[in-house]
C-alpha cells in the first residue's frame, strides 16, 4: 500500500523516481481504507530533506499512511521557504483537538543549549504532554529523543568530550521485542551529536527498556514499558551522503577539531558506504506495524 502525501510536496517526485508507491490525496480519498495518521514534528533545518528521508523509510509499508507536518509556532525556520511552510505545514493549535496513530519528533541542531533555553521549549513540552493522550506511539529521534527523555523521565543530556560522528555497530539486547523483530544481532546506525544521555539516570528509570547499544556510540534504542514512547539516539533515516554533507559543512565553517565520520567511507576510498538502510527500513516498519497500526482502534473514541 502507498503513502498518502500532498500532491505538490517536493518529496513526491523523488520518491516516485525510486519506485516507492506514492498516492496523492485525490486518489487516496476514493479508497475505502482507514489510513494510519502520522504527525511529523519537523525540527530539522533542512525540512524538505528530512521530509523525504522519513517518507522514504515509511514508504515500503503495506499500510496506507497519511502525514501531517508540524512546526512550532514559537519558532521561525530560516532554511525553508515560507511558501513551502505555508503550503505543507500546520501548527499545534490546528491539531490539538485531533488524535493521531503515530508521531515522529525529529532531531534539531541545538544540543549545545539547555532545554529551557530553546525558543520553543514550552510549546514542545505542551506537544509532548498532549501526545500522551492523543497519540498511540511517538518516535523521538536524536535531539528529539534527548528532549523526550528529559521531559517524560527527567533524564538529562550530558556534554561529550568529542562529537560522536559516523556509522556505528550496535548490539541488540532484547531480540524478542517487536521493535527489533527481524534484526540481526549486530546492525549499524549513523550518529551525529555532541551530547549523550545520562546513563546512570537511564538505568534508574524502571519504566524504560534499552533495546540496543553500541560500544562507541552508547545507548541507541529505548522503549517505554507501555510502548507509547520510543527514543532513538541515532539517525537511521539519513541518506547515504548526509554525514558527508555535514562533514564538508563543518570543514567550510573552519570549525576546530573536525574529524571524518568513523566507519563511513569505503576502505581506502572517499565514497561513503551505506550499511544501515535495510535495518533502518525494518525499524520504521516494525514501529508502524506493531506499535501504531496494531495498537490503534479503527475509530478513536
Swiss-Prot record:
- Cellular component, GO annotation: cytoplasm
Q: Does the keyword Oxidoreductase apply?
A: no
- Record-given protein name: Homoserine O-acetyltransferase
Q: Which reaction does it catalyse?
A: L-homoserine + acetyl-CoA = O-acetyl-L-homoserine + CoA
Q: Which organism is it from?
A: Bacillus velezensis (strain DSM 23117 / BGSC 10A6 / LMG 26770 / FZB42)
- PANTHER family found in the cross-reference section: HOMOSERINE O-SUCCINYLTRANSFERASE
Q: Which Gene3D superfamilies does UniProt cross-reference here?
A: 3.40.50.880
Q: Where is this site: Important for acyl-CoA specificity?
A: 111
The record, for Pfam families, names:
HTS (PF04204)
Classification from the root reads: Bacteria, Bacillati, Bacillota, Bacilli, Bacillales
Q: Where in the cell is it found?
A: Cytoplasm
* Principal localisation: cytoplasm
Q: Which UniProt keywords apply?
A: Acyltransferase, Amino-acid biosynthesis, Cytoplasm, Methionine biosynthesis, Transferase
Q: Mind telling me which InterPro entries this protein's record contains?
A: Class_I_gatase-like, HST_MetA, MetA_family
Annotated pathway: Amino-acid biosynthesis; L-methionine biosynthesis via de novo pathway; O-acetyl-L-homoserine from L-homoserine: step 1/1
Q: Which positions in this protein are listed as binding substrate?
A: 163, 192, 249
Per the record, the similarity remark reads: Belongs to the MetA family.
Give the Enzyme Commission number.
2.3.1.31
Q: Where is this site: Important for substrate specificity?
A: 192
Q: What does this protein do?
A: Transfers an acetyl group from acetyl-CoA to L-homoserine, forming acetyl-L-homoserine.
Q: Which GO terms describe its biological process?
A: L-methionine biosynthetic process from homoserine via O-succinyl-L-homoserine and cystathionine
Query: Which GO terms of the molecular function aspect are on file?
Result: homoserine O-acetyltransferase activity; homoserine O-succinyltransferase activity
According to its UniProt record, which residues of this chain constitute the active site?
142 (acyl-thioester intermediate), 235 (proton acceptor), 237
Amino acid at each position: 500500500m502507498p503513502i498518502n502525501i500532498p500532491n505538490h510536496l517536493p518529496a513526491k517526485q523523488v520518491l516516485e523516481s525510486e519506485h516507492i508507491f506514492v498516492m496523492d490525496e485525490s486518489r487516496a480519498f476514493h479508497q475505502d481504507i482507514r489510513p494510519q495518521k502520522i504527525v511529523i514534528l519537523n525540527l530539522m533545518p533542512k525540512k524538505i530533506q528530512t521530509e523525504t528521508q522519513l517518507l522514504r523509510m515509511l514508504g515500503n509499508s503495506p499500510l496506507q499512511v497519511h502525514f501531517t507536518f508540524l512546526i512550532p509556532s514559537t519558532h521561525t525556520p530560516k532554511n525553508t521557504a515560507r511558501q513551502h511552510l505555508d503550503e505543507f505545514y500546520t501548527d499545534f493549535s490546528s491539531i490539538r483537538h485531533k488524535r493521531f496513530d503515530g508521531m515522529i519528533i525529529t532531531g534539531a541542531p541545538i544540543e549545545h543549549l539547555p532545554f529551557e533555553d530553546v525558543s520553543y521549549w514550552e510549546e514542545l513540552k505542551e506537544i509532548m504532554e498532549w501526545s500522551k493522550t492523543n497519540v498511540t506511539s511517538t518516535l523521538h529521534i536524536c535531539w528529539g529523543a534527548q528532549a523526550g527523555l528529559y521531559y517524560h523521565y527527567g533524564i538529562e543530556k550530558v556534554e561529550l568530550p568529542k562529537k560522536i560522528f559516523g556509522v556505528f555497530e550496535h548490539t541488540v539486547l532484547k531480540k524478542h521485542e517487536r521493535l527489533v523483530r527481524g534484526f540481526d544481532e549486530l546492525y549499524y546506525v549513523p550518529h551525529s551529536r555532541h551530547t549523550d544521555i545520562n546513563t546512570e539516570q537511564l538505568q534508574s528509570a524502571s519504566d524504560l527498556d534499552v533495546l540496543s547499544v553500541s560500544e562507541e556510540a552508547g545507548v541507541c534504542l529505548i522503549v517505554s514499558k507501555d510502548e507509547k514512547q520510543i527514543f532513538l539516539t541515532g539517525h537511521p533515516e539519513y541518506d547515504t551522503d548526509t554525514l558527508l554533507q555535514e562533514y564538508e559543512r563543518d570543514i567550510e565553517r573552519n570549525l576546530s577539531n573536525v574529524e571524518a565520520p568513523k566507519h563511513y567511507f569505503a576502505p581506502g576510498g572517499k565514497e561513503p558506504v551505506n550499511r544501515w538502510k535495510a535495518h533502518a527500513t525494518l525499524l520504521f516498519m516494525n514501529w508502524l506495524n506493531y506499535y501504531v497500526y496494531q495498537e490503534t482502534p479503527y475509530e478513536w473514541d
